[in-house]
Amino acid sequence: MADPKFQNLPGIAYDQPDVYETPDDPELDTSDYYEEEPENEAIERLHISPSVAHKRFSGATVEGSVDFTDRIGRRMCRGYDTRGSSDYELVGQGEKETPVQKCQRLQIEMNELLNEVAALQVDRKVADEEKQSYDAVATVISTARKVLESLKLEQVLGKEQTPGSKQVKALISQVEEFKQSGVLTAIPTPGTDLAATARVASLEQRISQLEKVLGAQPDKLSRLTAATNTTNVLEAVRHLSTKAALIQPDKLDTIEQRLTSLAGKMDAIAEKSSGSAQDAKRDQKITELYDIAKRTEPVVEILPHVIERMQALEALHKYANNFAKIIAEIEQKQGTITTSLVNNKELLHSVQETFAQNLETINSKVAKVEQRVAAISSAK
């Protein structure tokens, strides 16, 4: 029977049953028979597991600098770039980067540059001078990377400057943890949602008012904190107000008088410090004594032991001194004896010569006497 709401409508047959027709299924042109292709040894058939391939390329990204060719060169061709556990969000073309995104991009580029420099350092075809330059570049890059890591922009600038994808991933991980824990929480009532929304709106209003008063540019706040040496805005304002109070006209005369008296005192101190020629000589002697004391600092610790040793060896030194004096006297006496021996040798030589001459004269005279005696005896 037709629905009562369709009564009194034209074109409806009320005396016939309701029929719901469906189109017939078309005949399938395909057959269940598949002709197996003959095996060809020239065709390599690889057995690839979809799950293993998905795990391998799950975190891979493709950029404009990829190169899937098999060219041979000094640099390796880049294919799919797997970031690993560190996921960084890159902004689109024309969009403005946040400071954290700039820092992350610089870290990635520095890591790539360090890898390239390390590959060039290992290369044997590169000259030693180029390797030294690469070492200097690697040192500079590592220092800059340490500086970037020490900045900790996410902690300094807050969550407003961090990319939104990290917050989304953190929320997803929290949801997964809640699912695994199985702890159920009650859905908040609409009244609590409205109260939380009102609280958030009031906080946003207060933040906007603070941004209007202080400014939303972090570089200005950093300059203010650097100038006042404080991170509290009220303390900075008080510091600036005290400085502004000092610049008032009624206090400038007092400041000028104090500066004049201070300048006079500084001149007097400078005159006293200059001194006369005697003071200069005294300072020079003091400086020399100080230099001598600085040079003898390494010997100061050994000096008491040396003095004790010298005192212990004092008697031995005296005996050695006396022995040296005795040896000197003996050498002197030996010298005099040697000279006297030389003189005695000369005298002996002269005596021997005179004795030989006298002996010859005596022999000649004795011969003459014998001749005379013989002549006399023959004459008788």
UniProtKB/Swiss-Prot annotation:
Similarity annotation: Belongs to the dynactin subunit 2 family.
GO CC, one annotated term: cytoplasm
Q: Where is the composition biased (Acidic residues)?
A: 21-32
Compartments where found: Cytoplasm, Cytoskeleton; Membrane
Task: Give positions of region: Disordered.
Answer: 1-32
Q: What is this protein called?
A: Dynactin subunit 2
Task: Print the organism lineage.
Answer: Eukaryota, Metazoa, Ecdysozoa, Arthropoda, Hexapoda
Gene Ontology terms describing biological process: centrosome localization; clathrin-dependent endocytosis involved in vitellogenesis; mitotic metaphase chromosome alignment; mitotic spindle organization; mRNA transport; oocyte microtubule cytoskeleton organization; oogenesis; phototransduction
Any idea which UniProt keywords this protein has? Coiled coil, Cytoplasm, Cytoskeleton, Dynein, Membrane, Microtubule, Phosphoprotein
- Look up and give the organism this protein is from: Drosophila melanogaster
Note the SS bond partners.
none
Q: Which residues carry this modification: Phosphoserine?
A: S49, S58, S86
- Membrane topology label: Peripheral membrane protein
- Name residues in a coiled coil: 100-135, 353-377
Q: Where does this protein chiefly localize?
A: cytoplasm
Function field: Modulates cytoplasmic dynein binding to an organelle, and plays a role in prometaphase chromosome alignment and spindle organization during mitosis. May play a role in synapse formation during brain development.
Q: Which domain of life is it from?
A: Eukaryota
Complexes and interactors: Subunit of dynactin, a multiprotein complex associated with dynein.
